[in-house]
Structure formats: C-alpha cells, structure tokens
C-alpha cells in the first residue's frame, strides 16, 4: 500500500504539477510578474490591486516578511492576477503585453523536456532569431526563451519520512524496511531539463 501511494504521488506530480502545460503557464506567469516588477521599479505605473502593487514596488526578503506583509500577501488571489493580466495586455511594453496575452489566451510557449541538459547554444540561437524578428535586445528575448530544470522525488527520507512500526516495537524508515526495489527507486531524485520558446520558432 505504501509503495502504491508513493508511486501515485510521483505520477500525480508529473501528470499535474509538472505537466508541460501547467509548467509552461507557471513559468510564463513568473516572467510576467518579473517584468511588471521591473517596470514598476523604473517608475512605470501599471494597473493592479493594492496588495499586488505593494509587492511590485518593494523588494521583500524572507528576513523582513513580518505579520503586516503576510496579511497583504494573504489578500492576493487569482482575481488580482487575472485582472492585472487583462489590463497589462494593453500596455505599451512589448514584453509585458505579449506575455500577458499568452496567458489570457492560453497560447503558451512551447516547452521541450529532456533527460540531458539543454545546450546554451540552442537557446542563444533562438534568442538571436527572436530578438531580430521583434526588434528587441537578446536580454529582453530571454523573457521568451529560457532554460531550466525540474525535479521530482516521490519520497524523501529527509523531508517527509515515513516510518514503519515493526512487530518488535522498533521503528524503521519505509525504504530500509522494504525489500522491494521499486520502493527504493521511488526515493531517487529525478531531474528533467527544459527549454521554453515561442511556437513560431519551431
């Protein structure tokens, strides 16, 4: 039963949280918020809710994340983000408006997964092509073309241990207590590499 639970957990992560569509949407959203914050800090006034504006105007670290900031953060929800994205579609900034349109229209970046690390040359050539086509810098093209990696570990002995109470009243970690190879393999960290880029560059 424990093995089935862990196997289901791994499959759930790959099929839901780490599915290419979910991952692509999350990565674009991160790029949108990064660009919005960058513009806000340069003095550009972007339409959004007060809680969202606060976090875009201020550089918050874990050290100064006090009760007041936590209260503001708790006021943020999907409505704040979606409303902002809808408004940002009409902004003059090419990067912010284009990425916002992608999310609203569900026209996401293409994402390619690989067991091997994506060569930097591959992303660089795509950046050059995209930058030239849209008359932007290669640094700005990095909002649309980027590499990274995702990790999935169905079971971590350190983070979320599952312990078995044996008949002799001793407690043992589930992987050590099991003689099944499948269970041991589920505790291994699986890493996949990705590259995101606009579909028209295929």
Task: Map each language-model feature to its residues.
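Histidine-centered, transition-metal-coordinating active-site segments
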Residues: 1-202
């Amino acid at each position: 039963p424990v093995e089935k639970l862990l196997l289901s957990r791994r499959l759930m992560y790959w099929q839901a949280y780490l599915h290419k569509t979910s991952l692509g949407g999350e990565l674009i959203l991160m790029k949108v918020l990064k660009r919005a914050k960058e513009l806000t800090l340069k003095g550009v006034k972007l339409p959004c809710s007060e809680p969202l504006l606060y976090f875009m105007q201020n550089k918050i670290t874990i050290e100064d994340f006090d009760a007041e900031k936590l209260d503001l953060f708790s006021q943020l929800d999907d409505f704040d983000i979606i409303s902002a994205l809808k408004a940002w579609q009409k902004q003059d900034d090419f990067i912010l408006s284009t990425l916002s349109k992608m999310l609203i229209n569900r026209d996401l970046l293409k994402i390619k997964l690989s067991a091997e690390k994506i060569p930097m040359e591959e992303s660089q050539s795509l950046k050059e092509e995209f930058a030239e086509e849209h008359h932007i810098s290669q640094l700005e093209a990095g909002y649309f073309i980027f590499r990274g990696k995702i990790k999935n570990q169905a079971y971590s002995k350190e983070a979320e241990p599952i312990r078995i109470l044996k008949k002799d009243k001793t407690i043992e970690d589930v992987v050590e207590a099991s003689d099944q190879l499948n269970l041991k393999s589920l505790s291994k960290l699986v890493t996949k590499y990705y590259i995101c880029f606009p579909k028209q560059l295929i």
